[in-house]
Swiss-Prot record:
Region (Sufficient for monouridylation activity) residue spans: 951-1495
Organism field: Homo sapiens
Keyword check for Transport: no
Gene Ontology MF annotations: miRNA binding; RNA binding; RNA uridylyltransferase activity; uridylyltransferase activity; zinc ion binding
Residues that bear Phosphothreonine: 57, 64
InterPro entries, per database record: Matrin/U1-like-C_Znf_C2H2, MTPAP-like_central, NT_sf, PAP_assoc, TUT4/7_NTP_transf, Znf_CCHC, Znf_CCHC_sf
Protein name (Swiss-Prot/TrEMBL): Terminal uridylyltransferase 7
Amino acid sequence: MGDTAKPYFVKRTKDRGTMDDDDFRRGHPQQDYLIIDDHAKGHGSKMEKGLQKKKITPGNYGNTPRKGPCAVSSNPYAFKNPIYSQPAWMNDSHKDQSKRWLSDEHTGNSDNWREFKPGPRIPVINRQRKDSFQENEDGYRWQDTRGCRTVRRLFHKDLTSLETTSEMEAGSPENKKQRSRPRKPRKTRNEENEQDGDLEGPVIDESVLSTKELLGLQQAEERLKRDCIDRLKRRPRNYPTAKYTCRLCDVLIESIAFAHKHIKEKRHKKNIKEKQEEELLTTLPPPTPSQINAVGIAIDKVVQEFGLHNENLEQRLEIKRIMENVFQHKLPDCSLRLYGSSCSRLGFKNSDVNIDIQFPAIMSQPDVLLLVQECLKNSDSFIDVDADFHARVPVVVCREKQSGLLCKVSAGNENACLTTKHLTALGKLEPKLVPLVIAFRYWAKLCSIDRPEEGGLPPYVFALMAIFFLQQRKEPLLPVYLGSWIEGFSLSKLGNFNLQDIEKDVVIWEHTDSAAGDTGITKEEAPRETPIKRGQVSLILDVKHQPSVPVGQLWVELLRFYALEFNLADLVISIRVKELVSRELKDWPKKRIAIEDPYSVKRNVARTLNSQPVFEYILHCLRTTYKYFALPHKITKSSLLKPLNAITCISEHSKEVINHHPDVQTKDDKLKNSVLAQGPGATSSAANTCKVQPLTLKETAESFGSPPKEEMGNEHISVHPENSDCIQADVNSDDYKGDKVYHPETGRKNEKEKVGRKGKHLLTVDQKRGEHVVCGSTRNNESESTLDLEGFQNPTAKECEGLATLDNKADLDGESTEGTEELEDSLNHFTHSVQGQTSEMIPSDEEEEDDEEEEEEEEPRLTINQREDEDGMANEDELDNTYTGSGDEDALSEEDDELGEAAKYEDVKECGKHVERALLVELNKISLKEENVCEEKNSPVDQSDFFYEFSKLIFTKGKSPTVVCSLCKREGHLKKDCPEDFKRIQLEPLPPLTPKFLNILDQVCIQCYKDFSPTIIEDQAREHIRQNLESFIRQDFPGTKLSLFGSSKNGFGFKQSDLDVCMTINGLETAEGLDCVRTIEELARVLRKHSGLRNILPITTAKVPIVKFFHLRSGLEVDISLYNTLALHNTRLLSAYSAIDPRVKYLCYTMKVFTKMCDIGDASRGSLSSYAYTLMVLYFLQQRNPPVIPVLQEIYKGEKKPEIFVDGWNIYFFDQIDELPTYWSECGKNTESVGQLWLGLLRFYTEEFDFKEHVISIRRKSLLTTFKKQWTSKYIVIEDPFDLNHNLGAGLSRKMTNFIMKAFINGRRVFGIPVKGFPKDYPSKMEYFFDPDVLTEGELAPNDRCCRICGKIGHFMKDCPMRRKVRRRRDQEDALNQRYPENKEKRSKEDKEIHNKYTEREVSTKEDKPIQCTPQKAKPMRAAADLGREKILRPPVEKWKRQDDKDLREKRCFICGREGHIKKECPQFKGSSGSLSSKYMTQGKASAKRTQQES
């Protein structure tokens, strides 16, 4: 990159992290710089030109015969772990290699836990993540053009101040020393900025410049200002060489030369284009009364044709009456009510009929809807009856036979009925609302953005958006319902106020004094809160204060409001308050559109819009539609009489230019003929020549104050200028696609450029010197180029002020550096990106932002499908491509060499465009201002000839929204066709099992039990520990009783598994009235006195508060919980099941081994607990035919089931196992071997069991549906046998569910396909069957719910205590070192070392060479060298070690007692290398390793 990378600094604002040296050394050779977040430090690299960056998988997974050596997954999440321990069964070579690998990672010494082995590192892109030190979610991040990390940068008009202390992006060595410093907390940064201030002295010392140099500097800076580049007012202390800043791109620049290079970059051009597009639309004038009237006529037409009328409402009421009669017999106590558009009239004639059933409290919603489904199926009036019980609002769907209308029946949908009641009342009281909403909804329907199942918006939100607009107008038409007139009201307390109902045209609100004060808290969530205040407010404004505004004007204003004025990215659409509600107040992520339902304020009703391309498409449609309705569109008779005169607006020289090139001449002939086909919309005046008045754009703007007028869609604008010399050319630019415009002064042709799409128009005018100076042209030279109206790219008058001051003698060839820079500077005042139809597949600029606060879903990188036409001619009948990408139609190629010669002369080509755009500005302003003159000189035009229509082509420009799956968030398919739905995986049939293979399966299952089950001595030792602890605690807590539960007592425990202890106090049956948190803290204080315990850690924030500690003598980790009595009975139940049949234990141990090897058995990391898998085994054995075990909770001696309540739950089960054959008739009937049962279990959960429809419940034999439990939103549903409200699978994400099911499917194949002999690479059958590279395909379990620092669930990165402590230490040291600048270089290296400890993965192998593992083949070593730079890490200084040891107390080993690692990483925990069980205890997988890496 050379000097290209030097001129920039990156501003460090409150929303952006800092960077280190590697951030600048990596990435695309043609890209000057890149801003990424801190979490990616060390993950990138500098590459050779043309070398494609690829993901590399560090880690040695051993030899997998089925996939070849070093085979791992292609899953990007599989790169998390710094180490991977081999499966339990391995040969000596595996063990030796594993020892070598672990030697550098697990030293078990607190003094050197941060010392990494020097050697090459392989940078790995694990997943798209936010900055580890970035809390604000709207931080700007930029895209690596090779796909390293892509995020979307939102364009904001409010730019940061020039004085903001900033960070160098590249530049002098002094600055490079400081770039590696990680980002500090906002508070500390602000304090540091105050301490540092700015350097004294001017940014540029003008006193040493000569008069000529000073003049040149001033002229150059004037040109830079046009591109939003300004001189800094003061020199930042951190980056003293910075002289300029780009307000658009938020970077610091060292010199004018580097500023010109920045101006030419795609990033800057894109921001300029966005700014100009917005300013163009912003300057459009209000519509004239005639326009408003024409718009109103178009809206009335839509309402009459599609809106609901009285007869339609009567029809829907009749359907409700018919349905009431159908339900009368089986649901006598229920009543029906219409809601939705059938009641509010804010819909269409063919809208669904929404009916809600009100039912008594003794019935449940599932019971009601199941009866509804049954009744409708038996009715003759309704057909096509179906149910969607897995929707957020479960409904029964049917179709009324006579009318054919679709009916959706819900039960207890109270919030929707309240919202409907509100909308209905507003529609009756404010007559303009109904047509406005119907027009808005019809617009959304035409644009295909009202389909939530396809990633669009729910239709009713457009009514809320219209109401919100009417409330936010400068002269509001509707009132808000909460505000400062209410005593004690403030936005921060908005969560305490709720709308309750509508009564007699007033809104009833209620205030509850909630301590939370969170907007998301609703009345239902705080039932114990007592309303302390009620009030009411009118639904509409007083008639005296209500302005009279036509619907047409409201429509144009609404489009402008959402297209330009309202900040959709940061604010919430809430009709409750006048003040703007921020997303932070609602604690909603900053993603796309946020809309609050006034009666269901907790959830964002626009959350179905889950794709950035769809959001960009909606903005595109809003802006396009606003532009269409804001500009005048007329039908004139002259368009029919003199269509060919439109071609006469060409100067003599322009004709020469066209005639000079035969292609242009040919297309000009076509152009003349094409106007005939344009229809009545194409207009022209009678004049044959066109001369532009010699007005500068500034003068024009001052004279007329009107905006440029542009064409869109197929509508054609009729311009009536001041005199007959100025006419409009209405032509179809399809005929000009691909034209080459010849420039005589350079003797060159511009590259082929596809500029037009259907509906765009060409305007050619005489560009004479003295009227408008052509950019870069010489005297007496006029050129003609095409005008692109599609992208809203015309600059405003303000942007065009400097046009007449351009240097005419700039060197077009670029041979003079200074001249070229000046020319490029001038041109870039108007320059945009090359038009979207470039002949290259271009990576998108923007991609979806990551979000920590909600479940993070990976979205695929988007590209714009560009088309290449070799002839330069696009298909005239073809519309735009389907809208598939970032919304950037004018994307530049990422690499300079891809543009070829075109890039060299791009500015010359763009120049002509912008001059013509400037001329169009004048013409339009003249035409809009001087219509009366036009009427005198041209044929009279009746103002009633303004014409508008609702057309999909006009609103969308031929684009269509991207279909996005709501399940996987990927494009191109719907949820019902999602390939990630594991039920859609086609399973291959399994061959019959041979007796020999069955015998092997039996041996494998029994071996698992033998290797992992604890001995009698160990069980006795656990009991001894309990007794010892009990007696010790009783000294301070008299009457204390300790009881073992969990794996220690249920019969399914592993060797060295944790010791779970429940503490109760005699005389207290429950913890009611006991301060559990204080008791746990006191218990921890007492335990610290015990000499045999270490690392006592109270955890009071957990759902069940516990004390964790390490028992020195046994080496066990112990958890003591308080009054976890239900768990004691769960333990008894499992113990009873394990005693019924030995096969139960064998299968449960096999299942636990299987899940540990696949890393799917750790609930703290987002998967299922071993308890949940045990319940899955028991459920399978109960459902087997014949069953292996009974349902103990359904066996009892009397006629009625006994009831024994603990914590409100019946904990009865049949525990007399000796008497079981008497009460269970099928005892002993199942004689299958344990191997058959194990394979049967895998097949049961992959082939038979429907996870979507049924619940895994061991308390009943009959099937239990997820709808009955109302757990339809979960993926795997496992019911606790006693606590029936506890779903053990509630914490699973979709990714983890798919990962678990994939492991089961692969296990079915491995255990279900007989093999005659095991491959030689497998030393034992155990390693063959439990090879994680096969079972999980080499992938690691996803961690989308885990903290990215410590690896645990329950909090996100910004709340991680480990992160806070590290930041606090760094801030203290940074503040200290501010006074000692000579230590900055050393400190920055040490900072980077600490950061890499938590964010970077280390690969250490013998001979210091990285081992690379890829799914297909190993990458060559040279690629690794190219992708990664060796980082020789120095050991940190002693003072940091002591500080780290103090800060990282939460990460401590419960075996050796040392800090800095956890139990599973401790070498003392590994045991001997030859021990099978000890190998298993390492789990060999992600949980231990990822924690170290991410911590």
